[in-house]
Amino acid sequence: MKLPLKWLKDYVDYNVTHKEFASKMLLRGFEVADIIPEMKVSNVVVCTITHIEQHPNAERLRVCNIDIGAENELVIVTNATNVYEGCQVPVALDGAILADGTEIKPTKMRGVLSSGMFCGGAELGINDVEYEGAGADSVLILNDGTKYTNGMRIQEALGLDDVIFDIELTPNRPDCQSIIGLCREAASALGQKFHEPVIKPVAGSGSAADYAKVTVLNPNLCPRYCARVVTDLKIEPSPKWMQLRLKLSGIRPINNIVDITNYVLLEYGHPMHAFDLACIEDAHIVVRNAVEGEVVTTLDGKQRAVTPDMLLIADPHKGVGIAGIMGGLNSEITGNTKVTLFESAVFNAANIRRTTQKLHHSTDSSARFTKGVEAVNAELAVNRAIELVDILGAGRVIGSMIDVCNADISEKVVNADVCHINRILNTKLSGESMAELLSSISIPAEVCENKLRIKVPHFRTDIEDGIETDWDIAEEVGRLYGYDNIEPTLMHGDSFQGRLSRSVIIEDRVKDTMAAMGFMELYNYNFTSPQEYDLLLIPENDEKRNTVRLQNPFGEDQSLMRTTLIGGLLRTMRTNCNKKSGHGRFFEIGNVHFNNPDLPEERKMLGIIAYGGTGNVRNAENFFTLKGIIEKLFEILGIENARFERGGGAYLHPGQKAVVSIDGEVIGEMGCTHPRVEKNFGLSCSAYLAEIDFNKLAAHTNNSRKYRPLPKFPIVPRDIAVVVDRNIEAQTVIDIINTAKTQVIVENAKVFDVYYPKEAGDKGIPEGKKSMAFSFELRSDERTLTDEDINRSVNT
């Protein structure tokens, strides 16, 4: 926020150096990021050209006599063709320093002594923003209608003799997005009285309701809408003092009516807009949501497609502005405007923020609305605009204001505990001292039984009533009292030994285990595209289609919150394969989100992908290596009773997939990619995937360590082959082996081979059957097993 020094002096008695002011403001929480001095030229003054004649020795040079307010006129030799007798121009005299550091000395030019040099905008270091015409590559003609005193410093003539403080603001202080708000804080920092502005009422004649009508269809997004009407407009440039202040604040002057709205924006921090009432059908302002497919052409000439969640200012038939962002081109103030309606409204901050983001268009108005404006300020702003209309004689003011108010504008009173504030700040201030400090920034407070009863001014929207009140007031008291005045003390309080939660411990263990098995961790975006679910062959009625749509996505390809990690894993694989990295092992622990009627549900998932190989078939990734990886992870986590059974998602190969369960609860699925999925994602080879519900996995994790003595007697390994029906799963046979009732202990049963006969009778295997080979271990805690014990157990 730019604060011109001269504007500051309208409200505050300024009695310090600029650096001291910056230091004092910093201690109050406002950093002065830059101090911009006045125009950096010296000994450049205004002159009037009294006579011009051709140079006697040069065809392209002219000799000018100039009046600088001294007794004798000076002579300037120039090649400028745009100067003429009677015009006023800047002239650099003997010893002048220009913006680029050039020093000017009297010089003979083809036999005629020139006492200086006429200056253009480039020599003065200014452009068209500071003064119209300064951007031209010629001498600057001072033709703004003002008769300047000859010899006047050019800084004063152009109004660029002001110092600008560029002040950084924090988001919690929207009241300081105004000159008045900053000056209020500056007065307190300097220990001076703040000269509160008083708006002079302009009664006018008639009633605004006779000229216009306002209807607010969505009071939640527009709690207050104030309007006043001015007729018999005289559209002309605003006075120089107003133009200078706008320019110094970075705003281009347009005409008196538009400049008034911008001036009030800077002064009070409340955005306004002026409509040409003749362009509003039936003179009826309607504040409504946009309709699907509606387009509004804004003042910058761009057509902007608006959506139903955006708020528009409209008439009964068309939009005439995007609320809080920018007015419409079809109702702008022009030289032919005779009647205007001044709008001063309050719009919902969150809605304006979303609209700004969707339209990718931010303005000075939207910047203030997104931080929040105050309902009381709407009336003050429109009345200040009317006062300026009266001061400038810009038109005939119509009497009463139109006010559609659904906002709470009642006075807010809060109570704060003096003792608690002192404990927070480690101070010993009395309630009276605190009240005096608060009064310096226009916050009235009374002391009653060690309590502060505070009437919160309308512009301090950051002070809330509730459990945070003491902290809000302590913040104000602390910065006003001065943090450098608070005695430093050592921190004290109860300390507790920190510890990681069970979930974090398990997550770290999973990450360590996966890394030990050669996996690298991924962090993919939580966003995905609607098309990805089609690429993964996910059925329309599948839970994974129950997605959360983003209101303001980066693009359509990132418009949904993901419900599975699989898409991101496959995209990572594709990227790596395209970069000639044909082998990889990756895992990701991330959140997925499902759309529920009340609130979206967030789940943490573990995703695993392995693909490619070293060229050796035995070392290539396959279904069984992935199964072994998952089993090893379960072993590290102390999980028993895990089962792998037929089933799994549609994105997995029908013959190479399984659901994973623990103690009967399904926690995930694993398998090889479906050939169609490989084609959809453009994969060069198959991938082996697993997705496991991390929270369910953690629930079955056993952190306790059980002591198991080493076997006293030898373990005997055995292999068997059995012929079973083709639809019999290996897990079914493993369960039979592990639960066989024998006199010895049978454990660690695993399948290591499956053979399907090529034809009936092949290797003695009947039609419809298959051969499966299993390994297992036999042992006894009491004795060494004999061949008879072993054979009896195997035959069982």
Where are these regions (language model features)?
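Mobile "lid/hinge" segments at catalytic clefts and subdomain interfaces of large enzymes
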Residues: 110-142, 155-159, 163, 311-411, ...
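Short, hydrophobic beta-strand segments
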Residues: 2-7, 161-170, 223-231, 364-371, ...
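A carboxyl-terminal module marker
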Residues: 2, 23, 439-443, 447, ...
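Phosphate-backbone binding interfaces of nucleic-acid-interacting proteins
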Residues: 1-206, 341, 358, 364, ...
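Conserved mixed alpha/beta core segments that line enzyme active sites in large multi-domain catalysts
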Residues: 48-76, 150, 244, 255, ...
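Glycine/proline-enriched, intrinsically flexible loops and inter-domain linkers
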Residues: 5, 54, 62, 190, ...
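Beta-rich nucleic-acid/ligand-interaction surfaces
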Residues: 40-43, 201-204, 455, 495-500, ...
